[in-house]
């Protein structure tokens, strides 16, 4: 399986997560979920011990934005992909936000409707 897919093109550089930045970068395109092997768990990092903990801080999913490319979306740690949702199904993100750091787009949301 290909580890990384084409990342979405960045339109401009801006700071901080916002709904406006998400709308600016996606131009109203409806994303499609790429289920693959499911949501990937991201664990908290203990700066003092310099190691990862057993605490899940977030999960990541991949979504395809037709005409734009593939984007990783950060979800809350307790997020689960809804049962019955098929690969490449159109999804609606709950409270999506985006930010641009060094021309790289980061997207987060609270869930999927």
Q: Where are the model-predicted features located?
A:
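OB-fold and OB-like single-stranded nucleic-acid-recognition modules
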Residues: 1-113
């Amino acid at each position: 399986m290909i580890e990384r897919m084409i990342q979405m093109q960045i339109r401009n550089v801006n700071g901080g997560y916002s709904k406006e930045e998400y709308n600016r970068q996606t131009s109203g395109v409806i994303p499609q979920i790429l289920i693959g092997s499911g949501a990937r768990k991201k664990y908290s990092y203990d700066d003092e011990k310099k190691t990862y903990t057993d605490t899940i801080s977030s999960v990541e999913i991949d979504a395809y934005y037709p005409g734009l490319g593939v984007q990783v979306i950060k979800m809350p740690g307790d997020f689960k992909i809804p049962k019955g949702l098929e690969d490449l199904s159109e999804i609606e993100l709950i409270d999506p936000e985006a930010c641009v750091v060094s021309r790289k787009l980061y997207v987060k949301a609270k869930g999927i409707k």
